[in-house]
UniProtKB/Swiss-Prot annotation:
The lineage of its organism: Bacteria, Pseudomonadati, Pseudomonadota, Gammaproteobacteria, Pseudomonadales. This is Nucleoid-associated protein PFLU_4577. Homodimer. GO terms for cellular component: bacterial nucleoid; cytosol. It comes from Pseudomonas fluorescens (strain SBW25). Keywords: Cytoplasm, DNA-binding. SUPFAM superfamilies: YbaB-like (SSF82607). It holds the Pfam family YbaB_DNA_bd. Binds to DNA and alters its conformation. May be involved in regulation of gene expression, nucleoid organization and DNA protection. PANTHER family: NUCLEOID-ASSOCIATED PROTEIN YBAB (PTHR33449:SF1). Belongs to the YbaB/EbfC family. It is found in: Cytoplasm, Nucleoid. NCBIfam families: DNA_YbaB_EbfC.
Amino acid sequence: MMKGGMAGLMKQAQQMQEKMAKMQEELANAEVTGKAGGDMVSVVMTGRHDIKRVSIDPSVLPGVGEDDLEMLEALFAAAVNDAVRKIEANSQEKMGGVTAGMQLPPGMKLPF
């Protein structure tokens, strides 16, 4: 292979890595809403698997006041976020031995 050809391949690889990093950031910042029970419960989650908001229709829990419902929504979001962080930490710990020595791009996690 000619010297110029190798330089071109390296440049393409760098451009692809930059595009992948940009796409990973866009995906991480994306927000989706999941709904259940005919929209009586909804959850807004980011691409980083962070629960941003939980909404529970008051009719699901009759007799529960608005303040208690808001606290329940916040506690549910916090519990799910805690579980997600624990799964991520466990995955990184388990995969650490497999990926030891590999030069992964910043922010790239295994498994994908």
